[in-house]
Amino acid sequence: MAGSEDKRVVGTLHLLLLQATVLSLTAGNLSLVSAAWTQEKNHHQPAHLNSSSLQQVAEGTSISEMWQNDLRPLLIERYPGSPGSYSARQHIMQRIQRLQAEWVVEVDTFLSRTPYGYRSFSNIISTLNPEAKRHLVLACHYDSKYFPRWDSRVFVGATDSAVPCAMMLELARALDKKLHSLKDVSGSKPDLSLRLIFFDGEEAFHHWSPQDSLYGSRHLAQKMASSPHPPGSRGTNQLDGMDLLVLLDLIGAANPTFPNFFPKTTRWFNRLQAIEKELYELGLLKDHSLERKYFQNFGYGNIIQDDHIPFLRKGVPVLHLIASPFPEVWHTMDDNEENLHASTIDNLNKIIQVFVLEYLHL
């Protein structure tokens, strides 16, 4: 009997071990399947708009409407915690919430220590289809650098970064009908949508340092890293859902050049170059020549400290659209409306809008 009992125990143990192995393998396979979507960004291919569609984009965007309705209300002093910061935040949210595309707007407010004590910061996150697994993300900062008033003048940071904010608002307006169609998800379309982020507290209050800079982006990157995505997921978070972070900064002066900073996103930089060339050849860019292209192939630029850094360190692919060299008016009182170049901004609006439509297959 003893021998029979031993065999039964051994047989039972063998069965339990086999079941545990099967369950483990099944769970592992489910985990792999559930995480497979995070790799789709690596082989995502854009659509290519034809000449007629490119013409429609050029006709659909309006530099005068952007200037009057989006940009001018932002050309104010708006350092974190200031009355202007509140006004800028309300302006951005109101311009987005009036659109048909049904953006979901979230304000991420938090306190952080600064050289002047604790300050309140508020990031603005505007998302189409938050339930989508993947998002193309456009971002900029809406705060202006704090400078003491000098001879009754204030620093309004036109290129830094009122213009990028206005460009993103104009993109949302000009593409409103097409972006609204992202609601119509079908099996033939990728589970992909668009997110706009307006960071607070990019600028240092005193001297740039790891502690005194990038307040909003540091906070949001950490928050997204600890937020499961899709909701309830155990192995993936909101950063996994970021296909590509396109960060706009120091835009608005004449004749900017944008280097390619990151080998990992070279194919997307190349796409911007191709769109620029296509629009130019169709006569849809103003005051522009290919002898002085915006998107230049002169090697990988030195990494510039900006709001993409906290996300880059956590593995998010980045396309950094910052003028390099910086505009001559950078961090001076002359970074104002008078020194902006409307044709350049209009041209870049067209290029970026085409890029977004192609990425999202719209």
UniProtKB/Swiss-Prot annotation:
Zn(2+) binds at D160, E203, H331. It is found in: Secreted. This is Glutaminyl-peptide cyclotransferase. Responsible for the biosynthesis of pyroglutamyl peptides. Has a bias against acidic and tryptophan residues adjacent to the N-terminal glutaminyl residue and a lack of importance of chain length after the second residue. The active site is at E202 (proton acceptor), D249 (proton acceptor). InterPro entries: M28_QC (IPR037457), Peptidase_M28 (IPR007484), QC/QCL (IPR040234). One of its GO terms (molecular function) is zinc ion binding. Disulfide bonds join C140-C165. It comes from Mus musculus. Belongs to the glutaminyl-peptide cyclotransferase family. The gene is Qpct. Glycans are attached at N29, N50. The lineage of its organism: Eukaryota, Metazoa, Chordata, Craniata, Vertebrata. The keyword Glycoprotein applies. One of its GO terms (biological process) is peptidyl-pyroglutamic acid biosynthetic process, using glutaminyl-peptide cyclotransferase.
